Amino acid sequence: MTMVGSRTSPIFNALRVELNAREAELVEIPLIQPADPFLDMAGEDLRRRIFLTENENGDSLCLRPEFTIPVCRNHIALNAATPKRYAYLGEVFRQRRDGAAEFLQAGIEDLGAADEAASDARSLADALSCVKAIAPDAPLEIVLGDQSVFAGMLKALGLPQGWRKKLLRSFGDAHSMDLALAELTGTQRRDPLPESLAVLVAEGDEIGLARMLEAEMLEAGISPGAGRTPVEIARRLIEKEDLAATHFPAAALDLLRQFLAIRVSLDTAAVTLRAFAADNALDLGAVLQKFEARADAIAQAGIEMKDIIYDASFGRPLDYYTGLVYEIRDASNRQDGVLAGGGRYDRLLTMLGACEAIPGVGFSIWLDRLQALAGEKQ
């Protein structure tokens, strides 16, 4: 019996052929990775699932939980020229309630391409081709979102910068978004802080607040280095106090909720968004031009736009995603979970230490889910 976790799996070999045909350098990434980049930049869900350890010097290490961050770090370390396309195929390790903790992923990271619309379309087309190569008869659902359109909507509504950042961090997480909107309307109750902390928060004294928090953590036997640092906690408390002082008109929040409820096929999405903006006197011109350029590029790549769902609320609550996000799923619901997911992350390489901005877009495929959908004989 050949399992998909094996590098001798037929699916593994078939995907290697697919990746080799796509003008991308197949790279080998070490299984053991420094943990800090994942802990600092990955979402809360992934942070909870990482297998952590330490080396003899006390440095935090982890088993590779995904490929995008280490592929980008490797590109920076090599000081490689762009544009550059990398492919990968190998094991990742995550604590999961269901399924094995070790499984295979494959994907492509496209770094430094000048034509954003074309590289976005190519990423989606490559992901779709790889999935169809393994499961040619499977009914697929493609869902597409756009972080930049949501950001443009927040700007057009006149939201303060602090609230824009908070809502962007919640984009794609329905529960977190509901809590943020309730907070913005002033309907969410907040637990009061102890008076000694509340005074420092009200004064915006980040240094004094961090010192007090560190002292309280040490007194309680909690290491200040475990989890968020006292400085990070202090900064977040002061930010929350500033945000709580801002309340937004109910009509504007209703418009935001109407926007998030938009879910249409991609071939009608641009018209729908332009009509929504015109009807409500919102300036979304620049972001919608980019949205339309990408839709045109997707059509030119041979993908039927009527088969793609644009969901205005679909995103990823990660700081480095900047535009396109997408997922390919099993439309028959026989297989739970995402088969392939991708998106544009133009901030990631700078956050990882690149000396200049390097745009990026990429995707990952879950081989175990794809095998289950394809019904490969074992």
From Swiss-Prot:
Alphabetical UniProt keywords: Amino-acid biosynthesis, Cytoplasm, Histidine biosynthesis
Protein name: ATP phosphoribosyltransferase regulatory subunit
Origin: domain of life: Bacteria
Gene Ontology cellular component list: cytoplasm
Other noteworthy facts: This function is generally fulfilled by the C-terminal part of HisG, which is missing in some bacteria such as this one.
Subcellular location: Cytoplasm
Main localization of the protein described in the UniProt heading: cytoplasm
Annotated family: Belongs to the class-II aminoacyl-tRNA synthetase family. HisZ subfamily.
Complex and partners: Heteromultimer composed of HisG and HisZ subunits.
Matches recorded under HAMAP family: HisZ
GO molecular function ontology, one term from the record: histidine-tRNA ligase activity
Pathway field: Amino-acid biosynthesis; L-histidine biosynthesis; L-histidine from 5-phospho-alpha-D-ribose 1-diphosphate: step 1/9
Any single biological process term in GO: histidyl-tRNA aminoacylation
Keyword Cytoplasm appears in the UniProt entry: yes
Chain's role: Required for the first step of histidine biosynthesis. May allow the feedback regulation of ATP phosphoribosyltransferase activity by histidine.
